[in-house]
Curated annotation (Swiss-Prot):
Keywords: Cytoplasm, Ribonucleoprotein, Ribosomal protein
Assembly, per entry: Component of the large ribosomal subunit.
Primary localization: cytoplasm
Family matches, as PANTHER family: 60S RIBOSOMAL PROTEIN L31 (PTHR10956:SF0)
GO cellular component: cytosolic large ribosomal subunit
UniProt source species: Xenopus laevis
Name this protein carries in UniProt: Large ribosomal subunit protein eL31
Domain of life: Eukaryota
GO biological process: cytoplasmic translation
Subcellular location: Cytoplasm
Length: 125
């Protein structure tokens, strides 16, 4: 049996969810829109990218860059790219009356080959 914890040993620290951070991910769109009808594929792909960003960054406010939108729609409504490389940036909301303190900006990262790419933290410059 695990040893019992004493009452006053709780870790006090800042939550990592409130940190401003930027990461690059490869999203497999193909598995997320498999079985979706032709006329709903590109719109569904954008919804899935938004859902992925909410899950990874834990902010309900997700903003998609126009270049990412153009990249998803580049081959039309039917032929969405199988994979896409995106940069998710969790940022502070400048708007004071907004209910969310943070938002996520999703930008497109053009790559020629997806082989061997992993999720990486990007330094804020």
């Amino acid at each position: 049996m695990a040893p019992a914890k004493k009452g006053g040993e709780k870790k006090k620290g800042r939550s990592a969810i409130n940190e401003v951070v930027t990461r690059e991910y490869t999203i497999n769109i193909h598995k997320r829109i498999h079985g979706i009808g032709f006329k709903k594929r590109a719109p569904r792909a954008l919804k899935e990218i938004r859902k992925f960003a909410v899950k990874e960054m834990r902010t309900p406010d997700v903003r998609i860059d126009t270049r990412l939108n153009k990249a998803v729609w580049a081959k039309g409504i039917r032929n969405v790219p199988y994979r896409i490389r995106v940069r998710l940036s969790r940022k502070r909301n400048e708007d004071e009356d907004s209910p969310n303190k943070l938002y996520t900006l999703v930008t497109y990262v053009p790559v020629t080959n997806y082989k061997g790419l992993q999720t990486v933290n990007v330094d804020e410059n």
